[in-house]
Each structure stands twice: as structure tokens, then as C-alpha cells.
Amino acid sequence: MILCFSGTGNSRYIAKKIAAELEDEIVDVNAKIKAADYSPVKTGENVIVVTPTYAWRIPRIVSDWLSKTKLLSAKRIWFVMNCGSEIGNASKYNSSLAERKHLCYMGTSQILMPENYIAMFNAPQLEEAKEIV
């Protein structure tokens, strides 16, 4: 099961690639959060959380949703985070979240995507963005 939260589409793009490779399904965490839906999610044993990096960790709104939502049958959890340059110490926070949910933390992976936090950084030109992706 892939749990995806996407603000600009980068995470959704990554989640779709992972889902195709693993022949797994994606749950749209954005929709769940907007609906205040904290009902249990039937995940199977393996859960992959795909999110952008906000302030060098997963978005607080996502960690709050994960904390409140029961992941049925889940045993192992991975985190895949996209970023413009780095995810900082996100793995520490992700490991702690996994522990609180009584899940085996399998790791955090970062995927570089075109920078899109334009309040602080310049977005890359089209050719550079294509090279990154």
C-alpha cells in the first residue's frame, strides 16, 4: 500500500511510479485529510509513505494524520520523500513515528525533484527540471 500526500504533483508522480513497479495501489492522503477521514486503512503488511519534504521532515499534517489513523495489517513502513536538495534529519522523525505506531521502520529515501518552494528558492528552468526528473 502506498500512502501519498502531494502538494504540487511531485509526490504523486513518484507514488505512481512506485505503484506501477510494485503493482500496488495508492491511497490519496490529501483527500483523507481534507475529509477529516481518520478511519482505518486496509494496508497489507507493507506501507510506503510518499510525501514532499517540509522543513526537513514530512509535513506535520501528514504525521498528524498517520498518528490518528490505524493502518490495518501493517507491519513495515518505508518513507519516500522528495526534495529540492536534502531531507535533513527526517529519518529520525520518521523512525520515531513508526515506533509510536508499532511498525518496523524500514528506512527513508530521498528523491531529488525540481525545486518548487519559490518563496525561498528559484525554480529551475525547464531544461534543468527535465534533467532532474
Positions of PLM-derived features:
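FMN-binding flavodoxin-like domain, especially the glycine-rich phosphate-binding loop
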Residues: 1-2, 6-33, 37-51, 55-133
